[in-house]
């Protein structure tokens, strides 16, 4: 398949997923209206904050976490190969690439995109919040996990920044000694 044909194929599947998202969104709005007798007019700020944290956690779970790697790899071409390091130690490496084109390639791209998965996650969280009263417990649980995940991301960023400052200080000290 030529590269132009592959690009056209991917554009087609991207369009299909965009239309599908709009259909799901409109369908969800009609479903909410029929279940609740109308559309919600307001969300308490604390509930919106918890929904945002739940959306953040679902997004990280799908896009980044090791526990869902098996699902992401369903839509990827994975190859294992071994390599010998300079020390003679054998290392097994895994190469993960999207399939050439088609639906699986598009789904792979979607699963690698935190912004894309974030929109789908937000849609699911909001619909569940307004339609299913029991979902509040799940949203709360995901929000707590999201807060923990966010704290970990911030702690990692602070640690990396501190390490960079330490390395810069050591480099300046070395330069002064010369």
Where are the model-predicted features located?
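Hydrophobic, membrane-inserted alpha-helices
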Residues: 119-129
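Hydrophobic alpha-helical membrane-embedded segments
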Residues: 45-71
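Short, Lys/Arg-rich, polar N-terminal cytosolic tail immediately upstream
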Residues: 1-9
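Short, highly charged, low-complexity non-transmembrane loops/tails of multi-pass membrane proteins
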Residues: 79, 161-177
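Long, highly hydrophobic alpha-helical transmembrane signal-anchor segments
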Residues: 8-55, 128-130
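Short membrane-interface loop/juxtamembrane segments of multi-pass integral membrane proteins
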Residues: 78-111
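Juxtamembrane/interfacial segments flanking transmembrane helices
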Residues: 63-75, 156-164
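Alpha-helical transmembrane segments and their membrane-interface exit regions
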Residues: 55-57, 144-153
């Amino acid at each position: 398949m030529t590269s132009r044909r592959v690009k056209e194929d991917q554009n087609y599947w991207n369009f299909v997923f965009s239309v599908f998202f709009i259909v799901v969104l409109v369908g969800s709005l009609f479903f909410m209206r029929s279940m609740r007798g109308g559309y919600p007019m307001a969300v308490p700020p604390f509930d919106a904050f918890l929904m945002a944290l739940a959306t953040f956690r679902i997004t990280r779970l799908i896009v980044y976490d090791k526990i869902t790697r098996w699902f992401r790899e369903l839509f990827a071409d994975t190859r294992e190969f071994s390599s010998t390091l300079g020390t003679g130690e054998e290392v097994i490496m895994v190469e993960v690439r999207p399939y050439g084109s088609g639906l699986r390639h598009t789904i792979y791209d979607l699963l690698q995109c935190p912004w894309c998965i974030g929109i789908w996650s937000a849609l699911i969280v909001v619909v569940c919040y307004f339609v299913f009263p029991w979902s509040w417990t799940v949203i709360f649980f995901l929000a707590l996990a999201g807060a923990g995940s966010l704290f970990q991301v911030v702690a990692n960023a602070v640690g990396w920044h501190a390490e960079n400052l330490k390395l810069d200080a050591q480099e300046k000290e070395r330069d002064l000694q010369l």
